[in-house]
Amino acid sequence: MFWTVPVTLALASGASAHVAAFVKGMYCEGGPDPNNYNPNSNTPVNPLWDLPFEQWWMQADRGCNKAPPPDGASVALPAGGQFTVELAHNQAQTTLSFNGQFAGEWPDGQPHPENWSGPGSPPDCIQDDGAMHTNNQTMAAGTAWAISYNDDISKVTMDNLVVFSVLEHTPWKRIATYDVPKDLPACPAGGCYCAWLWVPNGCGEPNMYMANYRCHVTNTTSTKQLAQAKPPTWCGGDSSKCTKGAKQMIAWNQATGNNVQVPNGASPGYNINMGWAPGAQNDIFA
């Protein structure tokens, strides 16, 4: 379908908007229907809440697991290096659509102060963009990437999908850069499966996010293998109580398939409270 840029683009925003990582190599680029490419799609950003495993896993509830990246695109993960994605509420607010004309410094494409925060002291939740699900940058829960060494996504499981990179205090600005472990080995010929992950810390419904990507590792000579992933545990920053080594993604507040328990009033996240230090996770190997 041919798209023209409308004078006023109706973007998902406010209470109806959320956040996902946009990059070439993502599933559901342009929406779930490969025959009807939508540059204004927000399909990957919608949260997962109280769903059976078969529906929340890989965003099967919206068909994203069956909408692979167009043109065989894949996210490059340089071993020991970094890769960059765009955190946004809508594909139109990224450089993937409309030549990036609606992309700004922030995920909603709008201007905000550098010290953006909610009202009051201490700050309440940010009111002018509830999709951020935070009070300010320091309270943003953190986002993560996980990888499975399977080119057939039907073979990806919680046990072989390993969190390999964590970016603290995100989502925040649109541009987000993640560190890659130096010992990640090469992927199979058909590539690997990756997931972008986020569990907000309050400021809205206690849901979670999981988006799908084809990915491949570059600049590597490593022959190491990933260890089997174990469920993370709440340790509240006490390293002696944390799960060590390779960890599964967080599955929380779903109808089935949950793998974590946290104290009343707490939220699990991709941060030190669940045993993840920021940056590349270099302890994930067998």
Swiss-Prot record:
Name assigned to this protein = AA14 family lytic polysaccharide monooxygenase A
**Compartments in which it is found:** Secreted
Keyword field:
Copper, Disulfide bond, Glycoprotein, Metal-binding, Monooxygenase, Oxidoreductase, Secreted, Signal
**Enzyme's top EC category:** oxidoreductase
CC annotations in GO: extracellular region
**Cofactor(s) required, per the database record:** Cu(2+)
Signal peptide limits: 1-17
* Protein family (similarity comment): Belongs to the polysaccharide monooxygenase AA14 family.
Write down how the cofactor binds this protein. Answer: Binds 1 copper ion per subunit.
Q: Does the keyword Transcription apply?
A: no
Q: According to the UniProt entry, what is the EC number of this protein?
A: 1.14.99.-
Which cysteine-cysteine pairs are annotated as disulfide bonds in the entry? C187-C192, C194-C215, C235-C242
Listed InterPro entries: LPMO_AA14
> In the UniProt record, which residues carry a glycan?
N115, N136, N219
